[in-house]
């Protein structure tokens, strides 16, 4: 079963666990354990000495998703085969017209810089570690989750593999905020977002979520709004609890201004695990996703965790190409050019499955808010044929004309016949005389 998120729990100082929205039959699966955790406290100011609940996140590695890998995945991944990369990168690969690289903050488990596809993509000086008490630059990744997320955005081309990031000239700001062992919570995520804003991020990717219903005036909500107000495209995964089909909001994806991303499969349909809800903005490939792992090589994984960076990569390309567009316009462009299965949006894939090439090629005008397609015009109702019970005046005139012609023909024939008889009779009389 792909990814089980942790239920609501009481956490220290109102902070709660955020689950990494990845996992599946192949690759890394995420599960939550919370033995003995207490119900959520209602007191606005929990005691400072409250014990840290014994919750944790368990990552169950499977198949080839171990690291470092000894071999690379040679083939072009299916999520890239559906694209014409030359057309996608016709204008930019992640650098703006001045040559500056678009800055994408990856708030996750860290981003490993040893993988050669990422070593040249990371701004180490801008990174930060919110997990290790000693601090750090955000390039420690003991889980591999953040390294995979970053690779989908900005992995550089490398000989021996067909995998490459969607914006291979973009720059990654590595922010380690979750270690997969319960240390990632709303408070640290709020701090990580603030750090991304301070370090000049133009796009922020968040591949984790909680179903605790948060308000906009929560610490996390305030930090998200600060990022949105700073004209940053904030992309977040919707979560992987969609197997039941139950619709519910997850955060930070459901905050206003955030582009919430669900997962689609190879048929451009919602992946069975992708969380549905009225907050879904778009969907993107999230099944059998190839990306970088710590050390060397690539692996395959599943989850909305890997749909979000696919969209973040497109956002980075658009930011590079259209520096005059606002973050909201970037989001609208992604939504307007998505491939739709219905005329408008739905709660499963939002405005549709992201089409990167279309987003970068149908960009001649500044985008507006998405609206439903008009659809085909209504068909004209069939009308019964008129039934004539009597003849029309024209038909009557035509009938009279036919009669006149017939009578005339008969008269001519009679006259001609009479003339012939008279002529023959006269001829006989002459012979008898």
Please annotate each region the language model reported.
Residues 177-251, 297-302:
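Substrate-binding/access-modulating region of protease and related hydrolase catalytic domains
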Residues 237-258, 262-279, 291-303, 343-349:
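Active-site-adjacent substrate-recognition loops and nearby beta-strands
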Residues 152, 286-354:
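Hydrolase catalytic cores
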Residues 20-32:
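C-terminal segment of classical bacterial N-terminal signal peptides
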Residues 132-214, 265, 341-343:
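Subtilisin-like peptidase catalytic core
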Residues 272, 322-417:
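C-terminal subdomain of the subtilisin-like protease fold in secreted/lumenal serine endopeptidases
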Residues 51-169, 198:
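Active-site core segment of subtilase-fold serine proteases
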Residues 407-433:
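C-terminal membrane-anchoring or membrane-association module
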């Amino acid at each position: 079963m792909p990814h089980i998120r942790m239920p609501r729990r009481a956490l220290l100082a109102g902070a709660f666990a955020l689950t990494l929205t990845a996992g599946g039959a192949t690759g890394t699966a995420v599960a939550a354990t919370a033995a003995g955790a207490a119900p959520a406290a209602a007191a606005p100011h929990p005691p400072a000495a409250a014990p840290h609940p014994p919750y944790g996140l368990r990552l169950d590695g499977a198949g080839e998703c171990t690291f470092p890998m000894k071999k690379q995945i040679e083939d072009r991944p299916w999520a890239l085969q559906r694209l014409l990369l030359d057309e996608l990168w016709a204008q930019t690969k992640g650098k703006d017209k001045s040559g500056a690289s678009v800055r994408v903050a990856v708030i996750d488990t860290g981003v490993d810089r040893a993988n050669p596809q990422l070593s040249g993509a990371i701004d180490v000086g801008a990174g930060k570690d919110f997990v290790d008490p000693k601090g750090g630059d955000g390039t420690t990744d003991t889980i591999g989750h953040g390294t995979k997320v970053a690779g989908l955005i900005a992995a550089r081309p490398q000989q021996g593999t067909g995998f490459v990031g969607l914006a291979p000239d973009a720059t990654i700001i590595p922010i380690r905020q979750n270690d997969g062992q319960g240390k990632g919570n709303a408070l640290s995520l709020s701090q990580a977002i603030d750090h991304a804003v301070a370090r000049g991020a133009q796009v922020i990717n968040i591949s984790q979520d909680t179903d605790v219903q948060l308000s906009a005036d929560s610490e996390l909500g305030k930090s998200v709004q600060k990022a949105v107000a700073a004209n940053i495209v904030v992309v977040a995964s919707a979560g992987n609890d969609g197997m039941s089909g139950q619709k519910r909001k997850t955060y930070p994806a459901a905050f206003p201004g955030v582009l919430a991303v669900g997962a689609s499969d190879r048929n451009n349909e919602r992946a069975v695990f992708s969380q549905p809800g009225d907050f879904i903005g778009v969907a993107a490939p999230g099944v059998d996703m190839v990306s970088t792992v710590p050390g060397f090589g690539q692996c395959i994984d599943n989850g909305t965790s890997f749909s979000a960076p696919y969209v973040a990569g497109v956002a980075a390309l658009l930011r590079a190409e259209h520096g005059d567009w606002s973050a909201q316009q970037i989001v609208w462009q992604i939504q307007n050019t998505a491939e739709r299965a219905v005329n408008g949006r739905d709660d499963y894939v939002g405005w549709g499955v992201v089409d990167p090439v279309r987003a970068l090629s149908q960009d001649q005008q500044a985008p507006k808010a998405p609206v439903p397609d008009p659809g085909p015009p209504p068909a004209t109702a069939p009308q019964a044929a008129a039934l004539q019970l009597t003849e029309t005046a024209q038909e009557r005139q035509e009938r009279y004309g036919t009669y006149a012609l017939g009578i005339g023909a008969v008269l001519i024939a009679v006259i001609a016949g009479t003339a012939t008889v008279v002529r023959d009779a006269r001829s006989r009389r002459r012979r008898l005389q």
